[in-house]
């Protein structure tokens, strides 16, 4: 079956013609897709059209390596994609507004959205280039595997699509529920505040601080932390299939620790450095996005927990459970948003509260399911407490350096570029002191071999 994947790779490319047709339809038929009252969104969809086609090819490469339990290329490509997405979106939106906007509010929104979609395409193109490089490096091994394949059994496309639909549909539904949550909240926010007499322009500015500024920044560490559960799925699935529940639980523990080692310092860093980060990236921000980051950065931990639990349940064949929990969380989210917006003056903070509650509901329900099927208990001390404690001195050092330096150097960029590397070193030392990880634990962290060489030179570190 492994070799069948190698032979089938070429056949999959032929099916990309479907993606090409859809992309062309979005390019030339955008006016038919976009509602009459949203014609300003047409340029954004047209710019996005090539990305639809390229995303399919990128998915083929990622899926190929994932099938061989090699998750590193996929994980790295996801990080690269998000970084380029965020950076190019900002630059392209600024460039499009200056080049094509006539200065009116609608025109700025129209061309800003169009420019932002360039970032999506840039992220996909960069990730695809990386995957092509990885494929090129491994090409000889792949061809050698194909040449030695004499025992595979061809499967019809009907059978392949049947399996894909059965396995992937619940995962897609779960992702759909999660993503539609943002659209529903945006609609409720605008509609309810409008009914309460809010100014339309002011409502738009408030929502932009949340959806465009806050969420764009926070999605970068969320992508970093989501690579761990993605890479875990094949191994957990294989261990569970053999009936080795103890090894399955150990694999999940390792994933939790890896995810939190990344998520905890990101959350602390964004909370402490929220203001300089926001004003560096979005100079026209009112400052609301910085406040949202300070209050909502810990949601990175909650989202990391929910991503891991979703991945585990999907890996053990319980794909329907994440769909159900996401649907329940969506209902709770909607109720919270409606109640808070109608009964309080929290404004956009109501969306932040609802986002946190959504993640908590998913975590609690998924945790119950994991206890039922795996008798699993979260490693609260090793997985969560140690990284959080190590993040505290890191945050103190980062804040002191950044805000102290800002007294003399009025440049957010310089202050951040100096404080972040120093804070990272402090976090590494603090984590080694508090957690006392073994060599095998360090090796699982990205750049683990380099971390081991550093740790071996420290008098307080011992390889357990």
Q: Which role does the model predict for each range below?
A:
Residues 2-16:
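Single conserved hydrophobic/aromatic residue that forms the stacking wall/gate
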Residues 72, 83-129, 133-134, 320, ...:
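Membrane-interface helix-loop junctions in multi-pass transport and translocation proteins
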Residues 120-123, 127, 131, 135, ...:
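Transmembrane helical elements of multi-pass membrane transporters/channels
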Residues 400-464:
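Membrane-proximal transmembrane or re-entrant/amphipathic helices at the cytosolic face
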């Amino acid at each position: 079956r492994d070799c069948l994947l190698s032979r089938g790779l070429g056949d999959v490319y032929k099916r990309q013609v479907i993606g090409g047709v859809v992309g062309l339809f979005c390019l030339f038929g955008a006016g038919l897709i976009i509602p009459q009252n949203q014609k300003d969104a047409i340029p954004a969809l047209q710019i996005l059209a090539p990305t639809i086609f390229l995303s399919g090819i990128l998915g083929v490469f990622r899926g190929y390596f994932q099938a061989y339990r090699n998750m590193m290329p996929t994980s790295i490509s996801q990080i690269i994609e998000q970084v380029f997405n965020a950076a190019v979106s900002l630059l392209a939106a600024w460039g499009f507004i200056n080049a094509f906007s006539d200065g009116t509010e609608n025109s700025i929104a129209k061309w800003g959205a169009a420019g932002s979609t360039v970032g999506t395409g840039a992220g996909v193109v960069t990730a695809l280039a990386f995957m092509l490089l990885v494929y090129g490096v491994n090409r000889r091994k792949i061809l050698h595997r194909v040449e030695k394949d004499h025992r595979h059994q061809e499967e019809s496309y009907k059978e392949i699509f049947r399996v894909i639909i059965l396995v992937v549909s619940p995962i897609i539904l779960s992702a759909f529920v999660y993503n539609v949550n943002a659209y529903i909240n945006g609609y409720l926010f605008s509609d309810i505040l409008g009914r309460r007499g809010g100014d339309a322009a002011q409502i738009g500015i408030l929502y932009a601080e949340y959806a465009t500024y806050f969420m764009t920044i926070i999605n970068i560490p969320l992508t970093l932390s989501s690579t761990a559960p993605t890479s875990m799925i094949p191994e957990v699935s294989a261990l569970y299939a053999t009936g080795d529940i103890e090894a399955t639980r150990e694999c999940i523990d390792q994933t939790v620790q890896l995810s939190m080692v990344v998520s905890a310092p990101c959350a602390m860093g964004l909370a402490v450095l929220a203001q300089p980060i926001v004003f560096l990236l979005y100079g026209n921000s009112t400052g609301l996005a910085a406040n949202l980051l300070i209050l909502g950065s810990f949601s990175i931990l909650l989202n990391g927990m929910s991503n891991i639990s979703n991945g585990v349940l999907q890996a053990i064949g319980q794909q329907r459970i994440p769909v159900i929990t996401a649907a329940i969380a969506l209902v709770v989210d909607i109720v919270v948003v409606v109640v808070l917006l109608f009964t309080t003056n929290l404004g956009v903070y109501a969306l932040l509260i609802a986002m946190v509650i959504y993640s908590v509901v998913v975590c609690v329900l998924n945790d119950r399911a994991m206890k039922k099927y795996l008798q699993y208990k979260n490693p609260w001390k090793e997985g969560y407490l140690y990284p959080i404690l190590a993040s505290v001195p890191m945050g103190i050092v980062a804040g002191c350096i950044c805000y102290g330096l800002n007294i003399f150097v009025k440049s957010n960029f310089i202050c951040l570029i100096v404080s972040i590397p120093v804070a990272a070193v402090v976090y590494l030392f603090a984590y080694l002191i508090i957690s006392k990880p073994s060599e095998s634990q360090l090796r699982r962290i990205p750049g683990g071999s380099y971390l081991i060489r550093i740790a071996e030179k420290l008098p307080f570190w011992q390889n357990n």
